[in-house]
């Protein structure tokens, strides 16, 4: 659909419904915790700008960011691999992807992301890390070898809103001279 009005309207409807759901959940783990629309748009723009071909998303939830990535992937000829530990949320994400006709560029993987990362030999030119923050540093052990050396990008969500929880990951990346890092207030 490439960011057509019907696509954007449906994304907005989904986002609003996810926000309402989250407001009813006392336990943080039960919330969908999708990224903000501005962040999602930034991700889609980044994929288009760098003409990404292999995209990895760690933390599908209900697929809000996945939909944005998949729309951009259709434009660039990319494939999105998205990881989610919760099968029910993956089924929701698949439903929305089919509804919005972007499912043809998405591979859904259900299970612990750590297992996927340990086994994967793939290189990705765009990686979105938006999962349980206490696992980020462990994931970095594998992600640093999965980022395409020529122009690959890793986007880490919650760097500002949960700075203390991701500080060790950010410090680890900053110490590695193979990578550059910056924080964007989106």
For each feature predicted by the language model, list its residue ranges.
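A short alpha-helical cap/connector motif
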Residues: 1-126, 133-155, 159-186
């Amino acid at each position: 659909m490439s960011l057509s009005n019907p696509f954007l309207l449906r994304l907005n409807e989904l986002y609003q419904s996810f926000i309402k759901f989250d407001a009813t959940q006392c336990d943080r783990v039960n919330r969908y915790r999708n990224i903000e629309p501005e962040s999602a748009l930034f991700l889609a723009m980044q994929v288009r700008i760098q003409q990404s071909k292999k995209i990895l998303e760690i933390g599908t939830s209900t697929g809000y960011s996945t939909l944005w990535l998949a729309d951009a992937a259709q434009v660039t000829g990319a494939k999105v691999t998205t990881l989610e530990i919760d099968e029910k949320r993956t089924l929701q994400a698949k439903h929305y992807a089919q509804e919005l006709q972007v499912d043809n560029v998405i591979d859904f993987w259900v299970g612990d992301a750590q297992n996927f990362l340990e086994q994967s030999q793939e290189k990705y030119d765009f990686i979105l890390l938006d999962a349980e923050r206490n696992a980020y540093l462990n994931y970095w052990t594998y992600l640093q070898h999965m980022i395409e050396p020529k122009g690959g990008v890793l986007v880490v969500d919650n760097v500002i809103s949960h700075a203390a929880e991701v500080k060790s990951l950010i410090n680890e990346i900053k110490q590695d001279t193979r990578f550059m890092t910056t924080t964007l207030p989106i």
